[in-house]
Amino acid sequence: MEGSKRKHDSRRLQEQEQPRPRTPPSYEEIAKYGHSFNVKRFTNEEMCLKNDYPRIISYNPPPK
């Protein structure tokens, strides 16, 4: 890791690799699974298949 510029480039590459933006959860999903989809969460297989989400959804806020 040489500097902040390199980290920024890797973040840009990760954004390009995502095939489509993830749609926000519907009200039914929020009621069923809870509202904290952006928090680190371990999902069961049924939810993974239904929502096409990865098994572990992790959200790391950028450091301030």
UniProtKB/Swiss-Prot annotation:
Entry annotated with the keyword Iron: no
Ranges of biased composition (kind: Basic and acidic residues): 11-20
Assigned keywords, A-Z: Early protein
Stimuli inducing this protein: Expressed in the early phase of the viral replicative cycle.
Compositionally biased spans, kind Basic residues: 1-10
Pfam family, one: Orthopox_F8
Region (Disordered): 1-28
Keyword Cytoplasm carried by entry: no
Family: Belongs to the orthopoxvirus OPG052 family.
Name of the protein: Protein OPG053
